[in-house]
Amino acid sequence: MVISPSLSALHTLAHNARQAALHLGSLNTAERNQAIAAIADGLTAAMPEILAANQEDCAAAEAMGIAKPLYNRLLLGESKLKSTIAGVKDVEHLPDPLGQVTLHRQLDEGLVLKRVGCPLGVLGVIFEARPEALIQISSLAIKSGNAVILKGGREATRSCQVLTEVIQTALAKTVVSPEAINLLTTREEIRELLGLNQYVDLIIPRGSNEFVQYIQQNTQIPVLGHADGICHLYLDAQADLSKAIPITVDAKTQYPAACNAIETLLVHQAIAAEFLPPLAQALGEKGVSLRGDSGTQKLIDCEPATEADWCTEYSDLILSIKIVDSLEAAIDHINQYGSKHTDGIISEDLTAAEQFCQRVDSAGVYHNCSTRFADGFRYGFGAEVGISTQKMPPRGPVGLEGLVTYKYQLWGHGHIAATYTGQGAKAFTHLDL
């Protein structure tokens, strides 16, 4: 049973996680992959127990009147669980990010410099209601040689407890310490976690923009921000209607609670009269409620859009629509109201598409495809710890590459710096190997 530690015990938990991380980072690829395989097998065997725990969470959340978008994130059905386990297996087969040499340079004869990939150490991950996030993050942490301290949303407490128990039990059968995966269960523990900069190397919050800002303002630990998902789709003057309709419907309705679902549709005025009526019909058949500017209201039946709609992440079957008079106007709107997440253009004009992709300031810019592809699993990362909308790397879906850093190794044979300084100093060769 996972028991939430008292605040005083959290230091002990973090210290033990640090020790587990040091050991984990020293293991070879095969040993870490065996641990990931054991996790996948354990999750598969425990599927009935996991789904039952999730049903308990869902029933309790429904009784409390939880919002529909949050409920949809909380729900872990059999299909989603199987897909998540498949993602764990994919992580097992990904290239090992540890030990990768990205610089190999001879400074002088017998003096060789290497830049080598290594783990960050201990991750603190605070995520929303999605229980599958715990599975994804745990597998990526093991693969990248990191320990992790997890805090899920209170709505998913039982699901997260059972998942952590299953994962720790699986790790106990391998050379990886079960203390590499840890779970916190109370909100009070978050503040103390944010103060454990002597143990925790990176905080990854997954939630609202306000929540991410709170984390950033209350910790000295580096934060990998994952904020709002206000995604846009722009239908250009040269858009193909046969592509525009299915892409728009998919981007809004395939999973409206996802952060990569579109919230605003921008339509060029040259095609608005032709495109909006069939689009509105297709979206209406999926139960989407539409909100439009004055021009949109003249063409289709919709509610009036307000200024607040352009900067709202609905996470629901609601879509705001605005008619624009140019590509430049669409780009300006996205850069003003977007969250730098993922935005797309539908157009047969490659020049317009290239301008859009160059000038839209987002982590993902797409041409003639759904924004729903903004996902670590779909990118071939196996899974993701989140999507970063900040400028500094990693950016976009964060997989293994975002969970490793590097160290410089210098191999010599009695070399000293004095040889290369002052009068008669010896020159470096700086020869890349």
Curated annotation (Swiss-Prot):
PROSITE patterns for this protein: PROA
Record keywords: Amino-acid biosynthesis, Cytoplasm, NADP, Oxidoreductase, Proline biosynthesis
Pathway named in the protein's UniProt entry: Amino-acid biosynthesis; L-proline biosynthesis; L-glutamate 5-semialdehyde from L-glutamate: step 2/2
Record-level GO cellular component terms: cytoplasm
Catalytic activity: L-glutamate 5-semialdehyde + phosphate + NADP(+) = L-glutamyl 5-phosphate + NADPH + H(+)
Domain of life (superkingdom): Bacteria
CDD domains for the chain: ALDH_F18-19_ProA-GPR (cd07079)
Keyword NADP: yes
Subcellular location: Cytoplasm
Enzyme Commission numbers on file: 1.2.1.41
Broad enzyme group: oxidoreductase
One Pfam family linked to the record: Aldedh
GO biological process: L-proline biosynthetic process
Chief subcellular location: cytoplasm
Gene3D superfamilies: Aldehyde Dehydrogenase, Chain A, domain 1, Aldehyde Dehydrogenase, Chain A, domain 2
GO function terms (MF aspect): glutamate-5-semialdehyde dehydrogenase activity; NADP binding
Protein family (similarity comment): Belongs to the gamma-glutamyl phosphate reductase family.
HAMAP family: ProA (MF_00412)
Job of this protein: Catalyzes the NADPH-dependent reduction of L-glutamate 5-phosphate into L-glutamate 5-semialdehyde and phosphate. The product spontaneously undergoes cyclization to form 1-pyrroline-5-carboxylate.
Name under which the protein is recorded: Gamma-glutamyl phosphate reductase 1
Organism: Synechocystis sp. (strain ATCC 27184 / PCC 6803 / Kazusa)
Taxonomic lineage from the root: Bacteria, Bacillati, Cyanobacteriota, Cyanophyceae, Synechococcales
